[in-house]
Amino acid sequence: MELKGKKVLVAGLGVSGIALCKVLDSLKAKVIAYDEKEYDVLKENLEEIKSLSIDFRFGKFKKEFLEGVDLIVLSPGVPIDSDIVKTAQEKKIELLGEVEFAYRFSKAPIYAITGTNGKTTTTSLLGEMFKNTGRKVYVAGNIGYPLIYAVMEAAEDDFIVAEISSFQLETIKEFKPKISCIINITPDHLDRHKTFENYRDIKGRIFENQREDEYTVLNYDDPVTWSLKNKAKCRVFPFSRKSLLENGAYIKDGSIYISVNGNAEKIIDIEEIYIPGEHNLENALAASSVAYLSGISADVIANTLKTFKGVEHRIEFVDEINGVKFYNDSKGTNPDASIKAIQALKTPIVLIAGGYDKGSEFDEFVKAFNGKVKKLILIGQTAKKIRDTARKYSYPEDDILFAGTLEEAVKKAYESAKEGDSVLLSPACASWDMFRNFEERGRIFKKAVAELRR
């Protein structure tokens, strides 16, 4: 793609947008960087690009921003029904999403993972499996390292393992992974995608350009994910925790097996997998399937599963103070993710929950308390909504506390906990009402836990 001298507007100046600006500048494009937020809010983000020859625009979108623009590259945070997108379509200006734009530069094969929950763990785990073959691998995408950096650096015989979100899949056109994978689909981001059906269909776009000699790996146990198989033009490879499969990855007699064309091979005994929890077994099956189909040996897969310690902010053990264990699950940004965290812990739980309202319902989340959650500390926009749902299911009002800050919530949780209990931050909500992102929320939680020792 020849961009020298072309006028390119980058919409949205988060992590992806900053990366796009840097790469476009290096390609000698004339870059316009736009964000609807004001400069003061973004000042910190813009430090690394303010010295580049970029034309910055901030605040409410104006049609004149698009004057003479040849191409618009959208960051994932910019909705497709926004004014800038509508105006670009009216003016017939080429519009590419960040992932689509990056894909067009890629020389290396991309192995793409999506799903509502488990994406980051599965992507990181698969990345480790590739690394353990001795090959050069880039782990990128929604995981924090922008895909545009990975494709610019990766050579033809390297690998790119990419976590892809629904926001990124919304704008793909030609994007075609070598192998794709959908771990699961449960309601999320309905404030953006409007209906669950629309959200499901966007997730299914991950394999829409793959052909009959390529694979998509789908969760056989999740009816919503499995229903997408009928849309696939490529081969479908299932994984299951519950069923024996003639062709796919499955559990038999306490071990993971993978069968391709009827030839089954044992991979590992489940008890040897380092990271605990049923949800992590699902992640292990998904990553192992993609790795095996790409030619990685059972030995390398097994050794990685024995040593991989999980990812930050996902049921991450933080500390034990006076017999109370603290876990950071800030990545629990929807009810289903937080249900899995509650199920993974085997002790009584003091739960810190609440945050930005994405339009989620909390009935199943509250039902999962099931006698395990002894106290509920609520923060953020959804605090009252979760409280009302908890009361609907007869959760004792005396066991519900409110906190104005996460630091206050940690103190209240510690005061409510006894020796042998766990304090779990698993908000079941996004972080954007109080924090820049879930990583910042997780770091503040860990800092607040450390303060308890002082």
Swiss-Prot record:
Keyword Transmembrane assigned: no
Keywords noted in UniProt: ATP-binding, Cell cycle, Cell division, Cell shape, Cell wall biogenesis/degradation, Cytoplasm, Ligase, Nucleotide-binding, Peptidoglycan synthesis
GO molecular function, one term: UDP-N-acetylmuramoylalanine-D-glutamate ligase activity
Keyword Lipoprotein attributed: no
Record: residues binding ATP: G115, T116, N117, G118, K119, T120, T121
InterPro entries: Mur-like_cat_sf, Mur_ligase_C, Mur_ligase_C_dom_sf, Mur_ligase_cen, MurD
Location in or out of the cell: Cytoplasm
UniProt main location, coarse: cytoplasm
EC number: 6.3.2.9
Pathway(s): Cell wall biogenesis; peptidoglycan biosynthesis
Top-rank taxon: Bacteria
Gene Ontology terms describing biological process: cell division; cell wall organization; peptidoglycan biosynthetic process; regulation of cell shape
Reactions listed under catalytic activity: UDP-N-acetyl-alpha-D-muramoyl-L-alanine + D-glutamate + ATP = UDP-N-acetyl-alpha-D-muramoyl-L-alanyl-D-glutamate + ADP + phosphate + H(+)
GO cellular component, one term: cytoplasm
Signal peptide positions (record): none
Family, per entry: Belongs to the MurCDEF family.
Name of the protein in its database record: UDP-N-acetylmuramoylalanine--D-glutamate ligase
Organism: Thermoanaerobacter sp. (strain X514)
